[in-house]
Regions:
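Bacterial N-terminal signal peptides that target proteins for export
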Residues: 1-9
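Bacterial N-terminal signal peptides
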Residues: 8-16
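N-terminal signal peptide c-region/cleavage motif recognized by signal peptidases
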Residues: 18-20
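Non-catalytic accessory regions flanking glycosidase/transglycosidase catalytic cores in CAZymes
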Residues: 23-262, 300-301, 305-333, 337-522
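Histidine-centered catalytic micro-motifs
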Residues: 265
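Active-site His/acidic residue clusters
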Residues: 268-291, 337
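Extracellular loop and loop/strand-boundary signature of outer-membrane beta-barrel proteins
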Residues: 291-293, 345-346
Length: 522
């Protein structure tokens, strides 16, 4: 039976109104909210809008990297259209090379002359050949083109600590100072790179080695000890829990908390979550699966709240970040594709899921200081899809475009009382919100209506803010599974929204069904 969700009051105070089936009505009770612009919260780190690129399906090859000899327009082997699209949404950080792939990846396979690099089988994802033509130098070349922070995941599952230590030295040692620095120079890059984040393994409870929490914590201490950046601070991110594995968080924080800078949390939204081989379709789904998707998405609030409470016990100063470095929707693969490639379409439903998650992260900016949606191109809840020379921006991409003002902005308290969206046994608050003040002093408000049928009248009382105008952009559509395709790339795109009014310190509007709206207050 789908779970009934009750959210923490910080995010919104829900008021149950009506009975199941009420979602079919055209009218809706009002949403009321209070925005306290004079009570600033934590800064939302820009890396909360990070991305994830794994050697999986067409996530790297064909999606980002086509090689210098490709007929597809490219800049040194990187797809020109993909680079331009990612830069346009200010991608702040990219995690690489995995994922499960990371704990089978040996960094030396991906350096040196491309023709001399060994070909191996990607046993995690699809059983295809991996020619290692995209390696360390190519990854940093991508980061340089994007102007993004670097997040390298080290192999703990099948490699010794010395391999991680040597990789860090290869990447960060000053020119000419060590044997590995000289090797890097011979391979074409004399200057060292900056590694902002080092992942100490991936999912050590699963594909990273099927470990017990205490054993994983001991290994984390060991690998963290020997991984030393030669050119400044490198934040070490431990392999943390999956969804509600609170015992894992307790063990990692208790045993290794003093030696790490972050703990990774992974959680994927599935419409059907009883059987991993039956997740539900990306398109053509019934409303019930829209509802369960929203309910399961909103569980992120519970997971972050409970994991943060455990972390607070060992780290009351909140030095160790909670890094939600794998999140997003996971559906059954597109029929006819390699199931190991995790290809799926991306619809308006995914846009709403993205907005809900970003709002949750914003409310937990004191602990959640980095996140990475899975994944950036062609895999799972992708920002971009490619097919040969063609590229399309997904609804999720456009949500990231709307939320650009949130990067590095200060979160503002917004409390919300919302009607409930009901479908069969599922009941969830219909509207989610977050608000920020950017570095220039402008206030922005995001509102997400997850009810697919009803528009919501919204009234926001504002304090500490002298706004007189509100305008912005909205993402919505006529169908729950409205999506962009290569033949129709603009079905779901942001549209101007001018239906908001500001008078006497109060913001009023009607929020369309199944929509993500960002308003700029002036």
């Amino acid at each position: 039976m789908p779970r009934l969700l009750r959210l923490a009051p910080l995010m919104l105070a829900g008021t149950a109104l009506g009975a199941p089936g009420m979602a079919q009505e055209a009218a809706a009770p009002a949403v009321t909210a209070t925005l306290s612009a004079d009570k600033p919260g934590s800064v939302i780190h820009r890396d909360v809008f990070g991305q994830f690129a794994e050697h999986l399906g067409h996530g790297i090859y064909g999606g980002i990297w086509v090689g210098k000899g490709s007929r597809i327009p490219n800049d040194g082997g990187y797809r020109s259209d993909v680079i331009a699209a990612l830069k346009a949404v200010n991608v702040p950080m990219v995690r690489w090379p995995g994922g499960c792939f990371a704990d089978e990846y040996h960094w030396r396979d991906g350096i040196g002359a491309t023709k001399s690099r060994p070909t191996k089988v990607n046993t995690n994802w699809g059983g295809v050949n991996e020619d290692n033509s995209f390696g360390t130098h190519e990854y940093f070349g991508l980061m340089e083109r994007l102007g993004a922070s670097t997040y390298v995941s080290a192999n703990v599952g099948s490699a010794p600590p010395a391999e991680t230590a040597q990789w860090v030295e290869y990447m960060t040692a000053a020119k000419g100072t060590t044997v590995l620095a000289k090797e890097r120079e011979r391979n074409g890059h004399a200057a060292p790179w900056k590694v902002q984040y080092l992942g100490i393994g991936n999912e050590l409870w699963g594909c990273g080695g099927n470990m017990r929490a205490e054993y994983a914590a001991d290994l984390t201490n060991r690998y963290a000890q020997f991984a030393k950046s030669a050119n400044g601070t490198m934040l070490k991110i431990a392999s943390g829990p999956s969804d509600s594995n609170y015992e894992w968080t307790d063990a990692l924080m208790r045993i290794a908390g003093k030696n790490i800078d972050g703990l990774a949390l992974h959680y994927y939204t599935r419409p059907r979550d009883k059987n991993w081989s039956d997740k539900g379709a990306a398109l053509g789904f019934p409303e019930r699966e829209w509802a369960t998707t929203m309910s399961h998405t909103l569980e992120m609030e519970t997971f972050i709240t409970k994991h943060s409470a455990i972390m607070d016990k060992y780290d009351p100063a909140k030095r160790v970040m909670l890094a939600v470095d794998e999140w997003g929707t996971w559906y059954d693969p597109t029929p006819g594709t390699n199931p190991g490639f995790l290809e799926q379409q991306n619809s308006l439903r995914d846009a709403v899921v993205a907005g809900l998650n970003i709002n949750i992260f914003a409310h937990h900016a004191d602990r959640v200081k980095m996140a990475a949606i899975a994944q950036m191109v062609n895999v799972l809840q992708a920002m971009l899809l490619t097919d040969g020379a063609r590229m399309v921006k997904t609804p999720t991409y456009w949500v990231y475009d709307l939320y650009k003002p949130w990067q590095g902005a200060t979160s503002l308290p917004i409390t919300l009382t919302s009607p409930w969206y009901h479908k069969d046994e599922v009941a969830v608050p219909a509207v989610s919100a977050s608000a920020v003040r950017d570095a220039a002093g402008q206030v922005h408000v995001a509102l997400v209506n997850l009810d697919p049928n009803r528009a919501m009248p919204v009234t926001v009382a504002m304090t500490g803010l002298q706004a007189t105008q509100a305008a912005g952009r909205i993402i919505t559509g006529t169908a729950m599974d409205a999506h962009n395709s290569f033949d129709a790339p603009d079905v779901v795109t942001p549209q101007p929204f001018t239906g908001a009014q500001v008078a006497g310190g109060t913001l009023t509007l009607t929020l369309p069904a199944k929509s993500v709206l960002v308003l700029d207050l002036r």
